[in-house]
Amino acid sequence: MKIIVPATSANIGPGFDSVGVAVTKYLQIEVCEERDEWLIEHQIGKWIPHDERNLLLKIALQIVPDLQPRRLKMTSDVPLARGLGSSSSVIVAGIELANQLGQLNLSDHEKLQLATKIEGHPDNVAPAIYGNLVIASSVEGQVSAIVADFPECDFLAYIPNYELRTRDSRSVLPKKLSYKEAVAASSIANVAVAALLAGDMVTAGQAIEGDLFHERYRQDLVREFAMIKQVTKENGAYATYLSGAGPTVMVLASHDKMPIIKAELEKQPFKGKLHDLRVDTQGVRVEAK
């Protein structure tokens, strides 16, 4: 069997740690024959373990410690430490591996509870499990999630040629906001979510770019962000935002305007790459060999 988990783009502006969307890049785990010891075959990086030290197996064995070892093949086009949920995809894959081999019959909500407990927040793991757009919260161990269709639009990801670790991106955030700042920031988030659910991408785009929770503190960590935002705005994009903690920059635009936006961005002296993406509507799934 093969376990497939989509990449995810979290926050979407003001939906800090609570809103995310699944997109069309994938982690795939092919489950092969039983053996005496675990082996993960991959070419993702020399520093990524091939045995039980791999996060995938740490998660699976944390849930079902006595799983029969197997040979696994891991492939992924989800870039590491780029703000597209690479670690979350591995967490969700590990849960699904335990679910399948341990015959746990976990519901999606049970998977979300486990994944959120491990990850600490649901913004990436929720869409990785459910697909589509997910608005979720985790308060004192209680996780709630609403799944919805993302409005019709094109996604364009600018993926830089450098990493930005989440812990580094979080280190520039303020320790706290004043009550007035919190009210303003949450009201913008409310409008962004409501507009997305209503299919109003113009209003959603304005609210997404009006984020007060994190982007203004993080934007200088992604040197291309300001220029990309300027170019995309001049050419009619709905919104441009930092995907997750960055450094990937996500552009949302109508189908007719995106080719123009992409062409203009390709003229810029950036060293990263542009990727056309779509919304993944399935989330984690298992395919028979």
UniProtKB/Swiss-Prot annotation:
Molecular function in Gene Ontology: ATP binding; homoserine kinase activity
Gene Ontology terms describing biological process: threonine biosynthetic process
Leading EC class: transferase
UniProtKB keywords: Amino-acid biosynthesis, ATP-binding, Cytoplasm, Kinase, Nucleotide-binding, Threonine biosynthesis, Transferase
Alphabetical list of InterPro entries matching this protein: GHMP_kinase_C_dom, GHMP_kinase_C_sf, GHMP_kinase_N_dom, GHMP_knse_ATP-bd_CS, Homoserine_kinase, Ribosomal_Su5_D2-typ_SF, Ribsml_uS5_D2-typ_fold_subgr
Catalytic function, reaction form: L-homoserine + ATP = O-phospho-L-homoserine + ADP + H(+)
PROSITE patterns, per database record: GHMP_KINASES_ATP (PS00627)
Annotated compartments: Cytoplasm
Enzyme Commission no: 2.7.1.39
Positions bound to ATP: 79-89
Protein's pathway: Amino-acid biosynthesis; L-threonine biosynthesis; L-threonine from L-aspartate: step 4/5
GO cellular component: cytoplasm
Function: Catalyzes the ATP-dependent phosphorylation of L-homoserine to L-homoserine phosphate.
HAMAP family: Homoser_kinase (MF_00384)
Entries under NCBIfam families matching the protein: thrB
Membership in a protein family: Belongs to the GHMP kinase family. Homoserine kinase subfamily.
Protein name in UniProt: Homoserine kinase
Species of origin: Streptococcus pneumoniae (strain Taiwan19F-14)
Source taxonomy: Bacteria, Bacillati, Bacillota, Bacilli, Lactobacillales
